[in-house]
Amino acid sequence: MERVKLPTLKGFNFKFDRDMIMPLSEEIEEFIIATPSLKRVKFTTQIPKDIQSNNIIEGIDDDIEAIRRIIGRKLIIDTNDNQDGKQKKVLNLYNAYRFILEKKDIDKETLRELYRLISDGLIDPRDQAKMGEYYRRDEVCISNLTYFDERITGVPYRIVDKYVDYLLEYIKTAKAENYTDSFIISQIVHFYLIFIHPYFDCNGRTSRTVAM
């Protein structure tokens, strides 16, 4: 098991099993090489497809051509309308992708702007009122599903800032020597931001975009 300099709430660091991943290394690298959207230089041409994949994860099955039309027309969106709400999510992701592609570094200000772009017009006003300058100022429930013994929550809001700083330092210092390393780093970043859950909503979209 390999330790990552990202602490749990109990104080010890998270670990992952590289030995389980390495047998898949060749398959991972072949997949990345064969997938244009995973290579940053070609990603701009693949944005509609990635937006579609991002939405499918959250149960929104948009047609790829519809996504292209939404992006191309820059529609005026009424977020109170259910259909327009879906279109707003498409435009927000498009703006967030374009923003993150121009950034070389992920820092606190970059993360705040990225979240602003992704969440624009989509946050419940009651939750928006409890947002701080960067992160939430109250607890958040991730799941109330009955098959869990207890409510699943994010990191306590008073230490969110500190835990996001741990993640930003990891992003800054993590070194990738090959495609497999890059894949592992991206998955760790995705997981840890979800673990923190620094916002009331749009955590998944933000974490997937940061992990790009």
Show which residues each predicted segment covers.
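FIC/Doc superfamily catalytic core
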Residues: 1-212
